[in-house]
């Protein structure tokens, strides 16, 4: 005779597993419906180096926001903090991370550790050591994509450390064209118009959630 309970349980598992965007695979962080399906690992691979670049200088803020969104996804997958490392340089018009702003974005400032080493090579070193410490859910770093410090060997070290610790590492290279790298994914990000929210009382259109125009290499 057929065990109906076991059959129903099996069907439930199959249905749940077939729902798009339900979750990433065990070795990946879920990024939601659509994006998960476009990635070979069913999400953002944990033990890997990923690169983000702005499509143009005007998209630097949008790319930073996208990086923050990925950090939010990583925080949902782990109770550990996130390291955000940027080589110190004058912020000019791009500014720096702002606590209340990132909190409104969904990134808990209490779980975010900011580091500002003096140069790009120092930033890469801090990122590698942070990965090897196994203390973080996610390691992010901002390095000038034109820097000589961002060599193929440097990306190999980050990739190796990420694999050994199964910790995702995101490298934001600004708006410069990417150099040789072993990054598993390379994201090019541009800002996109948000969907307006209709304000019922006054029938006004309010700014909606952030959106991005993304290409993946």
Regions found by a protein language model. Name each.
Residues 116-191:
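P-loop NTPase motor core
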Residues 75, 106-107, 160-167, 207:
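Arginine/glycine-rich "motif VI" loop of SF2 helicases in the C-terminal RecA-like domain
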Residues 27-28, 41-44, 92, 119, ...:
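Hydrophobic/basic alpha-helical segments enriched in Actinobacteria
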Residues 31, 63, 94, 123, ...:
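Helical mechanochemical/support elements of P-loop NTPase systems and associated helical scaffolds
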Residues 1-83, 101, 105-110:
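Detector for small/aliphatic-rich hydrophobic stretches
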Residues 171-217:
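Phosphate-binding/switch region of NTP-binding enzymes
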Residues 80-138, 142:
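Conserved inter-motif catalytic segment of the P-loop NTP-binding fold
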């Amino acid at each position: 005779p057929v065990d109906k309970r076991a059959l129903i349980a099996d069907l439930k598992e199959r249905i749940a597993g077939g729902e798009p965007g339900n979750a990433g695979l065990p070795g990946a962080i879920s990024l939601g419906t659509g994006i998960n399906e476009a990635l070979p690992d069913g999400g953002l691979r944990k033990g890997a180096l990923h690169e983000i670049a702005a499509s143009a200088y005007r998209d630097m803020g949008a790319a930073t926001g996208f990086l923050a969104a990925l950090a939010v996804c990583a925080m949902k997958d782990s109770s550990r903090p996130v390291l955000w490392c940027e080589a110190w340089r004058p912020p000019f018009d791009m500014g720096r991370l702002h606590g209340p702003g990132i909190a409104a974005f969904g990134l808990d400032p209490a779980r975010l550790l900011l580091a500002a080493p003096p140069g790009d090579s120092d930033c890469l070193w801090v990122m590698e050591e942070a990965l090897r410490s196994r203390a973080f859910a996610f390691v992010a770093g901002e390095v000038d994509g034109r820097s000589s410090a961002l060599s193929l060997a440097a990306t190999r070290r980050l990739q190796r450390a990420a694999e050994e610790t199964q910790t995702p590492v995101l490298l934001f290279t600004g708006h410069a064209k990417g150099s040789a790298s072993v990054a598993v994914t390379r994201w090019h990000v541009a800002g996109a118009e948000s969907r307006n929210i209709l304000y019922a009382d006054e029938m006004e259109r309010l700014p909606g959630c952030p959106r991005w125009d993304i290409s993946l290499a």
